[in-house]
């Protein structure tokens, strides 16, 4: 959070019950667009009336040739040949897999609404690598260009950016980047937030982007600011008509960053879905702001859904997971998972502007605010306004919080000027290891909540500036918590994130069950997640968004629990046959090292994902028959294996 620039953070999600008619209609439209209209977004074969262009090939392993680049037998052998050409709609540039090219890649030209330019890979093996020179500002660049599909390349190096897309002229359309690996951007002192690994940002006031897709991108290691940033622009006041629009970031992961993880700034109609961020806010000394993992700022109709943040930090304040920041309208954080953070789980802020129609629903918070400094002033759910800011209409609903702070600090901290007709904190489950459960002004209404305090007999509640020593005293004296309950548990571990409440449904809407198992069941080497995922592949050789999202969630789970002995087995049930080469490349690009993946040709494809958590003796302990979000599977595995062994996770990642 840069208080001088009034910049904090924000977020949103899918499948929401809403409390405001306009809000409900807008988010229903967004969800419908994401689920149906964008099922093929980013696929080169999705465009109708595609203009036929020329295919060009690049093989940097080949020595000097007189190749014209128009066949794999006569490829270009340097990036200079690519950078010198202005490509036309329908053209395609293919870099050979398993090769390295050195220098910046900046192909010129633009596609058209019916024929994007395609930059991709050919052959078999690892993604082709583009390695920036030590003085290059970026590894890949587009500037004042539009209608580009870029996929299946590894970019490394750059002093300011890994991937940088910008411009100075009007509206630039259709920038789709998919299946990229971007890493090791190291330069001098970080100057602004429009820097880092993947940055798609206007270069001038009045310039913006429309139709941006960042899909299946893994980005890590930078001493610049951002993991993935879309929007922004350091221009002061920017009218809403000049904000970027129709932006999707999905199935992506960022980690080991000086600043923010995944952020949307000045965006209309934005989505961050099935993505993850960790080791954010690693800057040693604060210089330009205080980061969070995943958030939005100055965003209208933006959603953060089914995403995960952990091991977040900050050189100052914030250091949280998710945040609906000031200047946002109709933003949501839904069905997401925040755990083991230095700062808060979820915040909603207002400063200088009105933050309107915010929804925080169905999220899971475990082991947040590990910093005593941050725990004291933030809590797990943090509502705050300053500089005459206002929050208008806010719903905090059906979230589960496991709160074990390093001191007697409240799980819920509300210091916000909240106005409007519907400002409800309801149907939440709060497990607090602190006797001080809640500290709120009287601007919020509390009802139908379930509170549990652990390890002590009493509880303390602060509401409207008055302190209450029992729950009944608080409920009667404050006139709050109609339909709510409170109980105490002697065992402190009950508040550490063991299980969801028995009466609650799972986040994804179906209660998983314990299954007895057969007497002849096979034993396993350890706790195992077995998942059968229906999938399809496009002509670029990439998995469909739903399958890619489930794979990303399971991969992130395995990254955390591999050192604890977790096994992961995945069966990909392809709806249509694909070449072994394409399938092999797609699996290799996912970097599923240590994960058993199979794709039998004669396997009947299920219509829904099926996932099981299986004990070492072969007993199926939990089973799900639909897309499985990070919170549900994360909690289930954590309940049997405990907190991830993060120190060993670091060693295995090296």
Enumerate the language-model features and the residues they cover.
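Acidic, glycine- and Ser/Thr-rich low-complexity intrinsically disordered tracts
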Residues: 27-49, 118, 197, 418-511, ...
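Acidic Gly/Asp/Thr-rich repetitive segments characteristic of extracellular carbohydrate-active
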Residues: 40-44, 48, 60-96, 100-101, ...
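Glycine-rich repeat segments that build the extracellular carbohydrate-interaction surface of secreted
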Residues: 56-61, 76-101, 116-123, 149-155, ...
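Right-handed parallel beta-helix/beta-spiral solenoid domain characteristic of secreted/periplasmic
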Residues: 94-97, 112-161, 181-190, 216, ...
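Extracellular beta-strand/beta-solenoid scaffold signature
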Residues: 106, 132-141, 157-168, 189-206, ...
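Right-handed parallel beta-helix
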Residues: 116, 123-125, 146-157, 171-186, ...
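Structural microenvironment flanking redox-active thiols in thiol-disulfide oxidoreductases
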Residues: 537-593, 598-601
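Thiol-/selenol-based redox modules, centered on thioredoxin-like
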Residues: 608, 616-654
